[in-house]
Amino acid sequence: MNSSCEKIFGVLRSPRVSEKSSRLQEISNVYVFEVSSDATKVDVKNAVERLFDVKVGVVRVLNVKGKSKSFRNRGGSRSGWRKAYVRLIDGQSIDVAANV
């Protein structure tokens, strides 16, 4: 693999599939991805455009805080992660299950 492919797969970790993300796909043409913690909007946009061969309109990125958990009176927390909402230009679509 060349370095550009490694960078793309380093930025995009996995698609997030949930009821909310499915609804966003149908209504607004928005796809949700889990991305690396140091990825920027520009990195995410370039990775999606190169990997799926589509045109990206808007990228919104946010940090998701890990949940607090306890097990046998010991406190702990799950690690946080970074989420990206990617809106495609009208007429474009991604088959997330097939490509990733």
Curated annotation (Swiss-Prot):
GO terms for molecular function: rRNA binding; structural constituent of ribosome. Keywords: Ribonucleoprotein, Ribosomal protein, RNA-binding, rRNA-binding. The keyword Mitochondrion does not apply. GO terms for cellular component: ribonucleoprotein complex; ribosome. GO terms for biological process: translation. Gene3D superfamilies: 3.30.70.330. InterPro entries: Nucleotide-bd_a/b_plait_sf, Ribosomal_uL23-like, Ribosomal_uL23/eL15/eS24_sf. Belongs to the universal ribosomal protein uL23 family. Part of the 50S ribosomal subunit. Contacts protein L29, and trigger factor when it is bound to the ribosome. One of the early assembly proteins it binds 23S rRNA. One of the proteins that surrounds the polypeptide exit tunnel on the outside of the ribosome. Forms the main docking site for trigger factor binding to the ribosome. PANTHER family: 60S RIBOSOMAL PROTEIN L23A. This is Large ribosomal subunit protein uL23. It comes from Xylella fastidiosa (strain 9a5c).
